[in-house]
Amino acid sequence: MSNPQTTIAYSLCHARASLTSALPDAAQVVHVFEYGTRAIMVRGRERQDRLPRGGVVIQHTPIGLLVIIDCRAEFCAYRFIGRDSNQKLERGWDAHMYAYPFDSWVSSSRGESARSATAGILTVVWTADTIYITATIYGSPPEETPGAAHGVGAAPPPPTTACPGTAEFLQPTADLLVEVLREIQLSPALEYADKLLGS
């Protein structure tokens, strides 16, 4: 396998389970954390940003594995579409690690939504008080077909999230996600939506 082109890594410190937010009998992990960091490495470039207090949800669903990081001012949601629909979100209590190979993924922040047909692996590692979430993405997405570029035959865009005005997320840390999504040549889902509405 070739060297990974993109890595998105979260370190969420002083994490503890949030029982009030957990759904019974659901394959999910819900935690709150005091602070954290997000590091992104793309083709030899690296950037790291601090995250304030927030929450994290990791949930296995029929449409893939969802990872949501919400720090109020800083928000990002990921959906990883796995290679095996029967995969379960089961924490390995002995190894304190969970791995989820995926074939494609979708990312949404407060100001940008994108999808990618690149494969990779998501790993989640638990320690006594820290959660490490790492998405390692290999290769480049396939070139778009002319039909898909105009929204013909393309999957519908992921649902948008309710978010405040643009001024709230035009900060350096929020700009990082936009920069990375463009750098790894993703197809903005918002662009798909605009073209579909205009057609």
From Swiss-Prot:
State the coiled-coil residue ranges.
Answer: none
Localisation:
Host nucleus
UniProt KW keywords: Host nucleus
Give the transmembrane ranges: none
Its cellular-component GO annotations read:
host cell nucleus
Please give the family membership noted in the entry: Belongs to the alphaherpesvirinae HHV-1 UL4 family.
Name of the molecule in the record: Nuclear protein UL4
